[in-house]
Design a protein with these regions (language model features):
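OB-fold ssDNA-binding interfaces and closely related basic DNA-contact patches used
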Residues: 2-176, 225-233, 237-245
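Intrinsic-disorder-associated interaction segments
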Residues: 9, 187-190, 194, 243-247
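Conserved, folded interaction/cargo-binding domains in eukaryotic regulatory proteins
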Residues: 146-153, 160-161, 183, 190-196, ...
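Short helix-loop boundary/capping segments
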Residues: 165-201
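Long, compositionally biased interface segments
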Residues: 196-259
């Protein structure tokens, strides 16, 4: 069984690809999560204060479009870019639920799977965050309530691995020394980000390479909305020219992720 795997074997692509979540990738034509740092993109700049001619003025200390790394029960760090070594990917659905009355805002999330071709139980006791299962032939014929529900449920690509931030700073813009190769989890629900990161995994699968054997360099791309606001999406570059060695600590991390 997949969950019995505890060792990375680069000579058994099919088994390892299944374990690392890329067995179902096709060409374009064809838990210990709480202990992992969380990766996200910081869309808005962080502001601070500085003194100019005896007066305090607001200044931008961390630019928008940086990668944010939230350390569990610790600080947050920011990098102009990042290099990740992905160990595996998983998939899930999630839905944002706005709180009413005394209830807080929350997310409904399903369990994770190595594909989205099955029904996934969620933390509300239903499946797929309430989204109807199976292929929908005529979306427009559905009741408006059902269409709204389907639109509210997001596909999520969850990436696990190690990350090294580029030029890391703290929330005040001060340079910091962040330990390299920090274990992370990254929940990717933006549609364009889902596709761009997914292409890296698809390219690995086409070449029968395991995610852990290669690194991905991350930049960001700015996107302007109709109201003038800007949001950022990942701009990944997969390095297929260099094969990374597997060390005992990598085996240990993989075992921890699979347990």
């Amino acid at each position: 069984m997949i969950n019995d795997l505890q060792t990375i074997n680069t000579n058994d692509y099919d088994t390892m690809a299944k374990a690392m979540g890329i067995a179902n990738e096709r060409p374009a034509t064809a838990s210990k999560q709480s202990n992992l740092a969380r990766v996200k993109i910081q869309h808005s700049p962080l502001m601070g204060k500085t003194e100019v001619r005896g007066k305090e003025v607001n200044v931008e200390v961390v630019e928008g479009g940086t990668y944010k790394l939230d350390i569990p029960n610790g600080a947050s760090y920011y990098g102009t870019g990042a290099i990740i070594r992905p160990f595996m990917q998983r998939f899930m659905y999630k839905k944002y639920v706005m709180g009413t009355g005394g209830a807080k805002n929350r997310y409904v999330k399903t369990i994770m799977s190595d594909n989205l071709n099955i029904d996934l139980k969620d933390n509300d006791g239903t499946f797929n965050c309430g989204k109807p299962s199976g292929w929908i032939d005529d979306f427009n014929s559905l009741p408006q309530k059902t269409k709204d529900l389907i639109k509210a449920v997001k596909r999520v690509r969850v990436v696990f691995g190690n990350i090294t931030l580029t030029d890391p700073t703290d929330e005040k813009g001060n340079s910091v020394n962040v330990i390299a190769a920090t274990p992370f989890i990254w929940e990717i629900d933006n549609r364009d980000a889902f596709k761009s990161i997914g292409k890296c995994f698809s390219d690995l699968a086409k070449s029968k390479r395991l995610p852990v054997q290669h690194s991905i360099t991350l930049a960001t791309q700015s996107n302007e909305m109709n109201n003038g606001n800007v949001f950022y999406t990942p701009a990944p570059t997969l390095d297929m020219t260099k094969t990374l060695d597997i060390h005992p600590e990598d085996q240990e991390m993989f075992g921890n992720l699979m347990s």
